Structure formats: C-alpha cells, structure tokens
C-alpha cells in the first residue's frame, strides 16, 4: 500500500471516529434517560421507567399553585405589548415606546432560541436514544423532520397567499400589493378608458375608539396601504377593504406561529407536572420561558392591522396562549400515576412533536420575524442608533432563552 493510500485511509478513519465522538458528546447518547445501567460501564439493561418514580417527591400543593402562577405570568407577558401599544397610540411617550420595542424585538429573539435550544436539541436527544433505534435508527430524523416542517410551512404560506389572490382578485407582491410602512405617495398611470388617475395611500392605524390620529411613526410600524387592483382593474378604495386584506395575511402568519408555540406549551405543561425533584429548578425557568414567549407573540399581535370590529381578537388569542400550558400541567397532574414520560411511545411522540415545532419556529423566527423586521420591511429602521438598539434587543432575547436551555 502506498503512503498516500495509507494516509487517506487514516484520515477517513479519523473523520468517522470524530463524527461518532461528537455525535455522542452532543446528544449525550451514552447517558440516555431511557436506559438503566447497573454502573457506568455496564450495558443496557432495560428501556423505559416506572410512572410512579417520577412522582415520588410529591409537592402536589406547589404543583397546583404553579398552574395559576404560570397562567398569570403568561397573561402578563402576552398582554403587556398590547397594553403598551394602546398607551403609546393614545399618549405618545418615548419611554413607553422604547419599552414596547424592547418587548417586540426581545420576543423575536426568544422565539428563535426556542426553536433551536428548546425544541430541536431535545428532539435530537429523544430520537437518537438507543432504545428507539428500532424506530429511528440509521438516519438523523430530528433535523430531517425539522427540514420537512420548514418546507411544509413555506408551501402552506405560498398556497394561502395564492388563495387570497384568487379569492379577492388581488395581485400580491407587485407595486399594487400591500406596503407596510411605505411613505405616503401617489402615482399615476395611463388607462385606456379613463386616462390618467391617481391612487391615494391610506393610513389605517387608528385609536381604540376608531378615531384617526397621528401615531408614533416608525416605532409602532404605522401601516400604510396602497389600494390593490383586481383583474378588472377595479380599485379597492376603502380603508376597510385594505385593512381586511392585510389582516388576513398577517393573521395567517400569526396562526402558524402560535400553533407551533401552543403545541410546544402543551408538552412543557405535561413534562413540568410529572417532573420529579427537578421541579424546583424547572418551575422558575418555565415562568421566564412563558413570559418571554408571551412578549414575542403579544408584540406581533400589537403590530397587526386590527379594525374596530376585530379589536377583540388579539385579546382572545392572548387568553388562548395563556391557558395552554396550565391546561397541560393540569392534565399531567391528572395522569401522573399512570403516565411514564420515558416509555417508548411517549418519548418518541415528544421527539417528533418537538422536531415539527422546531421547523415551524425556525421558519417563523427567521423569515416572518427577523428577516421581515430588519431586511424586507419598507419601514425597517434606518436610524443607526435605534437599529443597534433593536438588534441588541433581539440578540439579548436569543441569549437569555439559550441560557435558560441549561435548565429546561
């Protein structure tokens, strides 16, 4: 064997061994919670656990009280951006304005970190477990499911946008499409039948009482809509029609985002309720987790084009988010004597659901939130000092949520 062939074979061997070592270290595969060992060096004996062993520490009273604490925390986190938005609209204040911006962009960073640290990494740990090799062995299913989930959400949004275009006869994405925060202007073009005519631009930000006023520019992402043209070249000239169209687009993206977080919150509630001694550490972490995620969702609701007839919707959506984790905890307490979180079925289901949710939040966090806010929005911040502040808020949200991943 030549020296070159020997060197290539050795390099391939090192690459394979390095991959296996890193895979084991990152995924903690050798310390699988599903695998019981007699000592550190012994082979696998039994997979799964005893449902009763996860509840031997008691603290039932604290667990019941935790349901109401997390409910209150979720409500505060979700509704704080909505309240700040209303206050700033009615009485502009630079401090409240910056507090609102902090909640909005900090929440965006939280959602992105949740996708990678709190969903994708646990999904890898679960689906790579040795006890699940019969189901998921031979392929990296966790990132694969995450990738499929990203593509599914993209295709879903494309189809929904096409449906809106077909249903309302509107072209999306051209110069007549919705423009968020565009400068007020008008333009003219030749029409064979009607000659030259202009399209006005409508400011659709309104106060809670429905009376128009001058809202804080840029900071509340004041929405200005240019009328749309349909296939018959008939202009949509009413503000209510323009608002309705924009709201449908925004609400579609938000429902996709909230559905993933709700799915994740149910799992959080179940696992928190049936946790053992680690409940003391897990509980305060979940409080921060729910508050930060609530700020991220609430800030998105506050920036949407709600009209007088739909002003109640964001508050209802906020209540739905706030109830999900407490309901999951209550369900976990109800089945704690019989549910084994380390059983093959429940462990695999948690891994698959975490991977699906991570894909949705990766897409939503990068495309719908950060890319829209910093790259694609016509109203993106052009003031360098404020831009640095907004970027710092987003990175702080990501960092804090990633740090919390050490405990939950």
Swiss-Prot record:
This protein's source sits in the domain of life called Eukaryota
Q: Name one GO molecular function term.
A: zinc ion transmembrane transporter activity
Q: Where is the signal peptide?
A: none
Q: Which GO terms describe its cellular component?
A: endoplasmic reticulum membrane; plasma membrane
Protein's UniProt keywords contain Transport: yes
Q: Which UniProt keywords apply?
A: Endoplasmic reticulum, Ion transport, Membrane, Phosphoprotein, Transmembrane, Transmembrane helix, Transport, Zinc, Zinc transport
Transmembrane region(s): 64-84, 101-121, 141-161, 254-274, 279-299, 315-335, 351-371, 387-407
Q: How does it sit in the membrane?
A: Multi-pass membrane protein
**InterPro entries in the record, alphabetically?**
ZIP, Zn/Fe_permease_fun/pln
Q: Locate the Phosphothreonine modifications and list their residues.
A: 234, 237
Q: Name one Pfam family in it.
A: Zip
Q: Does the keyword ATP-binding apply?
A: no
Q: What is its main location?
A: endoplasmic reticulum
**Where does this polypeptide localize?**
Endoplasmic reticulum membrane
GO biological process terms, semicolon-separated: intracellular zinc ion homeostasis; zinc ion import across plasma membrane; zinc ion transmembrane transport
Concerning its family, UniProt says: Belongs to the ZIP transporter (TC 2.A.5) family.
Functional summary from the UniProt entry: High-affinity zinc transport protein. Regulates intracellular zinc levels.
Q: What is the protein name given in its UniProt record? A: Zinc-regulated transporter 1
């Amino acid at each position: 064997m030549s020296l070159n062939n020997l060197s290539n074979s050795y390099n391939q061997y090192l690459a394979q061994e390095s991959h296996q070592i890193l895979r084991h270290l990152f995924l903690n595969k050798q310390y699988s919670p599903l695998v019981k060992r007699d000592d550190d060096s012994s082979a696998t004996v039994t997979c799964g656990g005893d449902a009763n062993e996860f509840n031997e520490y008691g603290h039932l009273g604290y667990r019941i009280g935790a349901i109401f604490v997390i409910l209150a925390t979720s409500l505060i986190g979700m509704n704080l951006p909505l309240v700040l938005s209303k206050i700033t609209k009615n009485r502009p204040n630079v401090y409240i304005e910056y507090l609102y911006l902090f909640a909005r962009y900090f929440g965006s960073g939280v959602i992105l970190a949740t996708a990678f640290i709190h969903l994708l990494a646990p999904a890898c740990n679960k689906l790579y477990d040795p006890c699940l090799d019969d189901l998921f062995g031979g392929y990296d299913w966790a990132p694969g499911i995450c990738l499929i989930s990203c593509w599914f959400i993209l295709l879903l949004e494309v189809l929904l946008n096409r449906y809106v275009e077909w249903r309302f006869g509107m072209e999306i994405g051209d110069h007549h499409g919705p423009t968020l925060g565009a400068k007020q202007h008008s333009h003219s073009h030749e029409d064979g039948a009607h000659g030259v005519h202009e399209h006005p631009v409508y400011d659709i930000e309104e106060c809670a009482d429905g009376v128009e006023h001058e809202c804080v520019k840029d900071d509340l992402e004041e929405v200005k809509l240019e009328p749309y043209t349909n296939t018959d070249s008939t202009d949509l000239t009413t503000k209510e029609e323009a608002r309705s169209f924009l709201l449908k687009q925004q609400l579609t993206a938000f429902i996709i985002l909230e559905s993933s977080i709700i799915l994740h919150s149910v799992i959080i509630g179940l696992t928190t309720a049936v946790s053992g001694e680690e409940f003391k550490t897990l509980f305060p972490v979940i409080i921060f987790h729910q508050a930060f995620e609530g700020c991220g969702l609430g800030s998105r609701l506050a920036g949407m084009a709600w009209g007088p007839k739909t002003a109640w919707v964001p508050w209802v959506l906020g209540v739905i988010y706030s109830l999900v984790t407490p309901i999951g905890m209550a369900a976990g307490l109800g089945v704690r004597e019989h549910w084994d979180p380390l059983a093959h079925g429940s462990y695999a289901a948690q891994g698959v659901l975490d991977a699906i949710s991570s894909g949705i939040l990766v897409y939503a966090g990068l495309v719908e939130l950060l890319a829209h806010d910093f790259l694609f929005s016509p109203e993106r911040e052009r003031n360098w000092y404020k831009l640095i502040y907004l970027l710092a808020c987003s990175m702080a949200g990501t960092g804090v949520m990633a740090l919390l991943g050490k405990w939950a």
